[in-house]
Amino acid sequence: MSVSRVTMMRKGHSGEVARKPNTVVVSVPPLVKKSSKSRSFHFRYLELCRAKNLTPVPEIRSKSNATTTFLELCGDKLAVSDWQLLTEALHYDLVLQQLVVRLRRTYPQTNIDPIDTEKRARLFRQRPVIYTRFIFNSLVQAIANCVSSNKNLSVLKLEGLPLQDGYIETIAKALADNECLESVSFRKSNIGDKGCEVVCNTAKYLNRIEVFDLSECGLTSKGAEHVADMLKMQKITRFTEGWEKSLRYRSVDVNTIGGLRTVLLADNPEIGDVGIRWITEVLKEDAWIKKIDMEGCGLTDIGANLILDCLELNTAITEFNVRNNEGISKFLQRSIHDRLGCLPEEKQEPEYDLSCVNGLQSLPKNKKVTVSQLLSHTKALEEQLSFERTLRKKAEKLNEKLSHQLMRPDSNHMVQEKAMEGGSQTNISREYVARNDVMPEVIKNSQSYRQSHFNRLVNSAATSPEVTPRSEIVTLRKEQQLQRQQPPPMEVKHLSLEQQIRNLRDVQKKVDLDVEEEEEEEEEEQQAEESQSESEPQNEEQQHYEQQMQVQRKHLQVRKVRSEIKYVENNPKEAAKKNRESKSDHEFANERDFKLNPSVQFETDIGDNVMVNPGHRYEGGGGDTAYVYNYEHEQQQQPVKRGYEHGYVVGVGDGSHRRQRQSQLVEALVQKRVPGASDGHVAQFVSNLERQANAGKTGKKRLKPRPEDDLQVPVGDMHMESSYMSRSEELSSTDVTLENSDYETEATDSTLLSSSKYSSMHVFVRRKQSESMSLTEEAGDGDAGGGGGSGDFGDQNVISPANVYMSLQLQKQREQSA
């Protein structure tokens, strides 16, 4: 058969040539006459075999080549006619995905014999016919055309073929046209350093290539340098792609970027330590290469140390094969394996890709797992699930317990009892304090309370010339009115004073467990003050009473501040006009928080006992004329004033439990007086207080509070004044008590005097050293109305409160006997 006939047969015109041998052949484009089936290698090859009446090669019809996308050819035993049909069918293939052409046997001579004709090729017997130029040239052209045109091709393996000189360049040009290749192998093809350079220059731009096999290709250190250049270019390209994907703060998955993953350079003994140096320098900063095969590459301990240095920086490499390198010691080989964490081959388990299985979101994506890893992961998930179940059960129990506590009706009572038992005095609940506030009212109405209060009268003395002593006990007239208006109350069994003190002691022990040291310090200070004072020491009942009053004292929510002191300049000219005053914390708190004005404060009632506290003093004359104190003279003589001159009222004890009364109470008293009673001592006392408080002062200075000096004046410095009020003076119900005021428990002074059972009251007034005027001149005649008191104070008679009390008791007994 001539060459022209073979050419025509390749182009599909064999039938026309047979029918018209003497006619001129007109070439037609192959796509016009070829069907879709002819573009597949397998269909095209079977058509050609049928046309030539030849039996197909058994290897193509085997199970390995059963699919139309896979082709594996072994060219050792194929004849010339078989190669002609195979090359023609492969030349136009567009379906194959894997193409493998290999020689099973390796021959020492890899050159191509210059046999260019079919006749001479059929007579070639020394080696397989593929080593002839006629067959090998047509095969390379068919492979190159298939690689460049078939975009479905992903695997190309040309193993053991004599790809030398221009043949490898033809394959390399075809590789550049196909960007879908993932695996390229030239194993045992003996391409040399020149062929390696050509292939590497093409493969470094293939972004999808993953496996590049140059094993047994006769490479040297120069070829290793070309491989290093290919790896470097691949690294730069992938870093660029990773940077593009990391824009807008996105995370980059290294596995999603394509490129080389496996480089196989085994059985190239000429590479040596010099070639491995090029490769390790590039791999130090690479993050994509997973496997390097340098088996039998003539490496020594120097190359092994270079590999260890590379592995210290590169953690992406999972396998670095250095077997069959006689120059590397076993210790360094073991070190490389330990650094990689590789398991022995016999202990390695197969890995499975479970990404396609639904319901396994907890497993890492795009990663194969072994059975042992899957079991350990399952065990960890079970432990986590059991822990979550335990937490859920505990939460349900706690929720149920809290709901039961909230539904119980006595839950609030239990909380209050716990607060009363465990809390300190500052942390007592409001209910507990409110219960203690009820106790003073019960105790005040008892006879034992009045008897114990009289013991304090003996050692008491009036310390202020402005305020008279008042008691908080309801008067007899008030009690009679309440009994008339209201039904008889239930009988209350009052405890004795000793039992009440015991109960209060028990409460105080429970509350004051944390303040025992402070109480000891206070007792020492009290003992020191008692030793310095001239008054007689209090008895045991009085000390119990003070403790009782401290417990009964109502706790005001007052913000504690530091004591502020007004300082004045050391100017002798202005020293008489300016005062150095110090205010206590309670005074500042009352002024700022409660807005109390202490400019004019006084008591409104006199109780049915004759108790005089050092913080109280009553001033008034009996009869028509009242005792008037010269306040202007006192202000001129004494630049430093005491606190009681400006209306501070102190109750029983130290006075911290009593409120300060506002000056508006004076106006209320004056407005509620009956017309005819204005000449009484209360009306004159009120008018004197208003005039003296506002005399010579402007708006702000009138209401400016003054601190009080807690000074006690002994009984010897007091003089007595006898006051009397006409029993015929009748007051209205509004004059007797201020029922709409905040002090309903107090009664006016006229309530006591209007009763026929009581006589005149003796009042103690403090004697001042600065008084230059005679008290008798200011008092005038005090016997108006036939009172028992005398207005003559010239003798400065000093009486004892005990005598007053005894006289009152005798008078009371006489009236009862009468």
Curated annotation (Swiss-Prot):
Coiled coil regions in record: none
SUPFAM superfamilies: RNI-like
Region ranges (Disordered): 513-589, 691-748, 768-798
Compartments where located: Cytoplasm, Cytoskeleton, Microtubule organizing center, Centrosome; Cytoplasm, Cytoskeleton, Microtubule organizing center, Centrosome, Centriole; Cytoplasm, Cytoskeleton, Cilium basal body
GO biological process: cilium organization
One GO CC term, this protein: ciliary basal body
InterPro entries cross-referenced by the UniProt entry: Cep78 (IPR026212), LRR_dom_sf (IPR032675)
Compositional bias ranges of the Acidic residues kind: 514-539
SMART domains per UniProt: LRR_RI (SM00368)
Keywords, comma-separated and alphabetical: Cell projection, Cilium, Cilium biogenesis/degradation, Cytoplasm, Cytoskeleton
Biased composition (Basic and acidic residues): 561-589
Chief location category: cytoplasm
Biased composition (Gly residues): 782-792
Keyword Transport: no
Keyword Cytoplasm: yes
Family to which the UniProt record says this protein belongs: Belongs to the CEP78 family.
PANTHER family linked to this entry: CENTROSOMAL PROTEIN OF 78 KDA
Function comment: May play a role in cilium biogenesis.
Protein's UniProt name: Protein Cep78 homolog
Source organism of this protein record: Drosophila melanogaster (Fruit fly)
